[in-house]
Amino acid sequence: MGEWDLLGRLLDKVQSHSTVIGKVWLTVLFVFRILVLRTGADRVWGDEQSDFVCNTQQPGCENVCYDLAFPISHVRFWFLQIIAVATPKLLYLGHVLHVIHAEKKMKERMKKQAELDDQTNLFLRKAYKVPKYTKSSGKISIRGRLLRSYVYHLVAKIILEVLFIVGQYFLYGFTLDTRYVCTRFPCPHKVDCFLSRPTEKSVIIWFMLVAAFVSLFLSLVELFYLCVKAAKECMARRQDYTVTPVTPPLLARKSFKSHKEVFQNCVNEPASPENNMEEVHI
């Protein structure tokens, strides 16, 4: 199935921009959900409607009873579930690629600024932002906007996972019965319908359900881990910004100039010995 290969390539790209727990979540998604759905579930549910037999010859009765027992096929339901829980991850990948592109352009501007004279280059470096998400090794640092985006995508995954688990329970429960009783029109009376291989199908249902709960648990653990990490970084920044409240002398306060004023003096005023002496005094 080509759509699975495309989804696999996209999620493999996301893996390089995720936490360790996020990489484990992707492994669970690939091995315990997509792989089982591709190899086992398709074969087991290949005969679901053809082998759904009812003890009546009334035309249309079997189709109506099958629709009542299974409003949506299990395989298609799990397919929608995997697509839904993977979509927030793909949206996060789009944000990461946007940040990488923006900081790549920023690095190119800084490289052009480096060709200017040293004094002007010093002030321009202070005026522009420096890349803070991409490391020298090319990896992404999950912080700031990326951290918020990562947390949002985790919350969306958790909500979608819970909704699909609850939806599966209300649609057809977590086990399959051998016999289904149907009284829908156009069935002439109470009709007994029988399902093929209910035990084997119930085993796969429980397997996919356990995989969904493991995925939900990993998302909750990852969300807790990121919240603790963000709290520690916030406390560390507060300690770094804490300074001793010492009032500077009056002369130092009068002679203080902002970086913008110094830059304007360097640009507008011609170089002279008096200006040089003033700058040395500052």
From Swiss-Prot:
- Topological domain ranges for the Extracellular compartment: 37-76, 172-203
Give the signal peptide as a residue range, or say none if absent. Answer: none
Q: What does this protein do?
A: One gap junction consists of a cluster of closely packed pairs of transmembrane channels, the connexons, through which materials of low MW diffuse from one cell to a neighboring cell.
Q: Which GO terms describe its biological process?
A: cell-cell signaling
Mind telling me which InterPro entries this protein's record contains?
A: Connexin (IPR000500), Connexin_CCC (IPR019570), Connexin_CS (IPR017990), Connexin_N (IPR013092), Connexin_N_sf (IPR038359)
Pfam families noted in UniProt:
Connexin
Gene Ontology molecular function terms on file: gap junction channel activity
Please state what the protein is called.
Gap junction Cx32.7 protein
Q: Where in the cell is it found?
A: Cell membrane; Cell junction, Gap junction
Q: What keywords tag this UniProt record?
A: Cell junction, Cell membrane, Gap junction, Membrane, Transmembrane, Transmembrane helix
| Regions crossing the membrane | 14-36, 77-99, 149-171, 204-226
Entry's PROSITE patterns? Answer: CONNEXINS_1, CONNEXINS_2
Membrane topology of the entry: Multi-pass membrane protein
Would the keyword Aminoacyl-tRNA synthetase turn up in this protein's UniProt record?
Answer: no
Cysteine pairs forming cystine bridges in this chain are: none
User: What's a single GO CC term here?
Assistant: connexin complex
Gene3D superfamilies, alphabetized: Gap junction channel protein cysteine-rich domain
Q: Note whether Cell division occurs among the keywords.
A: no
Q: Which family is it part of?
A: Belongs to the connexin family. Alpha-type (group II) subfamily.
